[in-house]
Amino acid sequence: LLADIEAATSEIYLESYIYADDEIGHAVTSALCHAAERGVSVHVLVDGFGARNFEQDFMPRLLAAGAHVMAYRREFARFRLRRHRLRRLHRKLVVIDSRLAFVGGINIVDDNNAPEGMRPRFDYAVRLEGPVLRQVHHAVRHMWEIVSWASLKRRFRQARMAPAGDTAVGTQAAAFLIRDNIRHRNDILHAYVHAAG
């Protein structure tokens, strides 16, 4: 991920539920800042609960470098019970230059740095290229638009980027599915059942 961020030339979208103040968080932030400083359009979207310290730990540095940064459903009253609090941004996505993406369960956190007595977390992500990138790219840009509007922030004007190509890369088949608790609750399950025949 870090090498691909450093190689970016036009745009980066990063979405994460957790963005920790640890070695990984600082390394990713440094790479994103370097990209923004060299003119790459950097968009970082984190969850307002899962990454609740992001705004004080990393946001000033990213903004100073020229990155666009937002939090999804920021938590102002942590101990207040409201139904909307259950709706979080659990996606872990990175799209770089409309040419590659990382999709999976890996947050921006050092998974091996577990508190005393706890096992480290093991999660996975895949690096994607090829036609499936169109869907991933559309998903991150669409979420950015929604959160920009919902936050009543000045909508960051997004430059039109060349769409991902239709040329297959490798021999694996891939699909990108979005799951949430309302409209797409069972999409992934249905895709597994369909793929299994």
What residue spans do the PLM features occupy?
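Charged, low-complexity intrinsically disordered terminal segments
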Residues: 1-197
